[in-house]
Amino acid sequence: MGCAYSKTCIGQICATKENSIRQTHQQAPSRGGTRATAAAAAVEEDNPVFNFSSDAVDDVDNDEIHQLGLSRDQEWGITRLSRVSSQFLPPDGSRVVKVPSCNYELRCSFLSQRGYYPDALDKANQDSFAIHTPFGSNSDDHFFGVFDGHGEFGAQCSQFVKRRLCENLLRHGRFRVDPAEACNSAFLTTNSQLHADLVDDSMSGTTAITVMVRGRTIYVANAGDSRAVLAEKRDGDLVAVDLSIDQTPFRPDELERVKLCGARVLTLDQIEGLKNPDVQCWGTEEDDDGDPPRLWVPNGMYPGTAFTRSIGDSIAETIGVVANPEIAVVELTPDNPFFVVASDGVFEFISSQTVVDMVAKHKDPRDACAAIVAESYRLWLQYETRTDDITIIVVHIDGLKDDAPRQLSSTGTQLQPPIPQVVELTGSESPSTFGWNSKNQRVRHDLSRARIRAIENSLENGHAWVPPSPAHRKTWEEEAHIERVLRDHFLFRKLTDSQCQVLLDCMQRLEANPGDIVVKQGGEGDCFYVVGSGEFEVLATQDGKNGEVPRILQRYTAEKQSSFGELALMHNKPLQASVRAVDHGTLWALKREDFRGILMSEFSNLASLKLLRSVDLLSRLTILQLSHVAESLSEACFSDGQTIVTKDQKLQGLYVIQKGRVKISFCTEVLESQNVSSLTTGITNEYDNLEIGTEVSIEKHEGSYFGEWALLGELKDSLSVVAVGEVVCVVLTKENFESAVGPLTNISDDGPKTRHSSFELSKESAKVTDTTALAKATLADLEWTTCLSTTDCSEIGLVHLKDKENLLSLKRFSKQKVKKLGKEAQVLKERNLMKNVIKPSAIVPEILCTCVDQTFAAILLNTTLACPISSLLHSPLDESSVRFITGSLVSAIEDIHKNEILFRGSSPELLMLDQSGYLQIVDFRFAKKLSGERTFTICGNADYLAPEIVQGKGHGYAADWWALGVLIYYMLEGEMPFGSWRESELDTFQKIAKGQLTFPRVLSSEAEDLITKLLEVDENLRFGSQGGPESIKKHPWFNGLKWEAISNREFQVPQEIISRIHHHLENDNVLPLETSKSLDTTEDQDAQNWLEEW
């Protein structure tokens, strides 16, 4: 159900839906007469103005675009808004316009960069912007706006709103006397017009942030999560004052409002069942992984918006995503040097204060825009696998005096409902202290899960970007010249020394002859250039009064340390000018591909991660933790014979050798410690019988390490280290380590060694044949050896009886976490299904016993598990391997359905393999007993949900066959068939609902046919629904597969699966273990109650 007042429901003030629609229709102009009436009202005067918009369709390229006179029917200025200038910014990069009534100037610049989407390299920039100076007929009015589109038709929506919003604002009858009311009305009218337009805004729309300057007063209107920020001088500091507060579910007031309108507010983890949907799990310091709360209709998996207000989004509007803007009215003072308007792509990883600090470092707004966009771009690639579209406008306020006329009275403009969200400020009061109870969310500083997966793949597979071999060996002078040019360049300022060296190696030498065109206006460049010698001129053909006029805008020389083309490193937007060689010269070129490779693969950081992973003491850290540690490393260089540590010093940190070798001398008594594995590995058999106190010398080479004991606070003396040849080390001190990830506890020796030995044992171990002895086993009888997989409240690992060697698998639930998450009923349901309903088979292992202790409730399984299927999918599997896994799963689902159970667990994270390579199903958390009815419960891995689940229509057994199709596609292609919900949820929703399917890799025709039939949108026609599981088994793709042999575990497991399991067990880290020491072991009566049935 939706909210009847959702179009005007703001805070505690609501107007009826009928009144809202009536008011909007009265204000909406007739579509057909807009242009004709506006054209008739055009009267040219002599005042030059600047109008810039992000679309260049029908643009007029002219230095003198004349403002229009006022007409009685309020149509003045409309025509001019569609005739925007595409001319270039002047050489200083900014536009200057006067505000005559207050005798000051606005100096502005802008930059809009299309995002980088690896799976959609040609995706349009969905951001748009508008700058109109002046705005309308009054030279005191100036308009700046940023519009961030989203959804399949987001680009069209943002362009539509950019044009219509300005028109509606100028047309409003109270624009001259009450700009705040006019802004509110313009947003609502534009929203209604977008609904009525041919553009499909059902699952698409745009956020909007606009700033209108009138004299010394600015009116800020915001709908969404873009932002406007004002700089203010306070006590010698420059402080960021947020003029808008992001409208997202992070705000308690917005969260409550959309819930009253019928929205479900959940993160993707909650949607997928990884976290309790009844517990608010966002807004804490721990939740910084790019999984924000989103809005969903009551019984559907859409629309999934992460904001609570926007223009368009007609479906989201039914659950409270309204177009009503929040409006702030602020009076400028001489203490306000500039303001910034930007899309949320800027503020995802950069705070408002950081933006203000960066702008303050640049005299020219253009340079500030470029610096902020480049830093945003860099941070997106550091923490994500893609970047958002990024748009920014910077406006400097020059020459404003205290004696300038004031336009607000001391009491401010009094505004009545239905426009309550108006904040009026004077001086230094910010919205957050003037009745705004919310603050903008802190920026993200953790890697996204997609980024973590990409790093893991790079570490496992070696698919990291590799720099090209330089065709020309640079001289010392050439490298020094390039370094001087790049030293203070905004785009390269944050690169590490190692990255800078790689960048130097990537720059290729180009020779240019007089008259050669290096880059051509209108073309697409992909290189950044540093001028090595010679002279180059910048040419642009611009429209003048007498037609096209070529102009020389600038000259580049090596003496000026010139460079150009930096924006080509970030996008392929058509070039605004040509560059031509005046005489013979040389250029150093850096390709976009190489620049992006340096940033995305984090070349030096990836090497650091590999080095850190080799340290036994750090082997249990996650990729995210290792990444934080890698950022804390420092580099130290030593010459041949230089002493790194003397015997009277104590080593202060971990040293990892990147280059060269070192000689370490120490007394054998040092080896008595458990945490000196780096020294013991270098000791040969001849030293085994040496007496305590004997001095030993060993050598450590590139890739080795020493000093790990210092991370635990152990200080060893009687040890010296000397460089042999030139040596480069990275150093990690205890203080830096603990600052990055916290204290490192002393890890015992049951980690990787146990994991490896368990694999060796598994070759001989088989299922327990005599199960009677284990029927009454307790957790005290079992010894936990290895953790294989974890969820929010459980973990699966290997155990053995303390007097036996046979390895078994244990699924244990943390009693404390189950209670905290409110999952008692879910856990009991899963246990009952596994123990009492589902019959054991070759694929569903037998339950040997269930047991409980003070900390855990556990299920002992008669199988020796190896890993989840996801651990093997660092690259696509071959078809024979996928066929084997799929055949096993089809047999299992067939048996599960016979027991009237809907599985909903066909994802590689939930499905396990045993150490023989056979599929094992041990996770039934999403399973449900059906009795012929449909279920409307939404759960399961979001990427595997069927269209009927996404659309909230209810679902049955056919949903399992859809998920099977998704799984087959993923195992063969290495990517999801409809994109990942974590990267573009709206696009994925629509693709699932429409069944839009493509095959990037060439598969067999049989495989494509089976996948296509399983991924049929109509569940009645879906393979498996018609003809049952037998129709799937008889598909030609399964020809040669012996179903009975699979059921009897007699089918030969494909070698590809065996080899990948071997590789995983030999090389991958075990997961961090949950021990009883980390949990509250206090007995809880409630816990005992729900466990009585265990």
Swiss-Prot record:
A nucleoside 3',5'-cyclic phosphate 1 binds at residues 491-616. Binds 2 magnesium or manganese ions per subunit. Keywords: ATP-binding, Hydrolase, Kinase, Magnesium, Manganese, Metal-binding, Nucleotide-binding, Protein phosphatase, Repeat, Serine/threonine-protein kinase, Transferase. ATP binds at T791, D792, C793, S794, E795, I796, G797, L798, V799, K811. One of its GO terms (cellular component) is mitochondrion. Mn(2+) 2 binds at D148, D344, D388. GO terms for molecular function: ATP binding; cAMP-dependent protein kinase activity; metal ion binding; protein serine/threonine phosphatase activity. Gene3D superfamilies: Jelly Rolls, Phosphorylase Kinase, domain 1, PPM-type phosphatase domain, Transferase(Phosphotransferase) domain 1. In the N-terminal section; belongs to the PP2C family. The protein kinase domain is predicted to be catalytically inactive. This is Protein phosphatase 2C and cyclic nucleotide-binding/kinase domain-containing protein. It comes from Arabidopsis thaliana (Mouse-ear cress).
